[in-house]
Amino acid sequence: MPYKVQSSEKLRKSGADFETKAMLYLLNFREDSSQINYFVVDFFNDITGMDRMARKLWDVQSKASKTGSAKTIGRELVTLYKNHVSDFDFFTYIIFLGGVPDTFRIDAKQNVFQSTNITPKALKSVLSGLKEECTEKEYIESHKITDESLEKFLKLVWFVVDDKEPADYIKAIISNHPKIVSSDSELIAIFNEIRNKQSEKKNTIVEGVVIDHIDEVLSYGRHLTTSEIRLLVLQRIINSNPLERGVPTPFIEIVSKFPEEQRQSMIEQCQRSLCMALFNNSAAQGFWKLFEEIYTLLMKYPNRNIDFIFQRIDGVVIDECPNFDVLSLKYFIAKIKEGLLP
């Protein structure tokens, strides 16, 4: 059976900020974050994570309010439930919350939990709110709204209470290497750029669109990728696009020694290696650790050449980025130096 898009929306800034937090939660704060390659914006739900081959979906509904009642939270689950009873297979259901009532949780210290940590009274209200909202929606067939089905669904939902500032989500992308970006204002500026990029994805109209297979969602361009987000962060830090064509000025000293007929091939190989290193999900932490080390050395020795910086990088740190070889790492150093230093 096909899937029909209904109730896509445009948000105020506060809601947009919160959707960005929800997306960055998927990117960095789950044990299975490394499996997520695409972040689909306001198509299936506020945010839906998707793996590289469109076989797995992480469905997220966000609710920025910190004061909603248990019944209101139940109402907010309606789109997740709609997807649950659809013919598409969603791997995980998440509601990302700005806050919950004091009487909502059994253990108030848990910010990521399932229905087993919700008090019986609150859970009853959640169920009531969800049932009422489902009944009001024309896009959920009445025979699918049963207590048994709703209760089964609630056992699958993850409740995530946001306990972080925007800057914290960016720190997680750069793997908490504080030397890379020194101030929270810079981190917030990066967060805002990601938010704006995410909001741009809503400029197309998809209300009423029907798709037969999950992968068809990519045809509508309402997605960001893990790689795009990392690249955006890196661009902001070094004030340039590291994947841009051309030879960085500090690298010319190395290129000039290379046989002329082999130069273009060597440069292209360096660019490919940098691209693979940046987009290697399994080595993301090592990439940012290496970047921090290069960044620190360049700040300490701004007038020294690429070979000098290369010789002072810890070999253990280099080994954590298997996509680089000697020349491509020197190329990366040159790219960073060109962006950071006049």
Language-model features: locations:
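Acidic metal-coordinating catalytic centers involved in nucleic-acid phosphodiester chemistry
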Residues: M1-K10, S65-Q311, D325-L327
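Catalytic centers of nucleases
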Residues: R12-K13, D17-T79
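Generic structural motif recognizing short loop/turn segments at the entrances and edges of beta-strands
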Residues: Q35-N37, R55-W58, D89-Y93, L327-L329
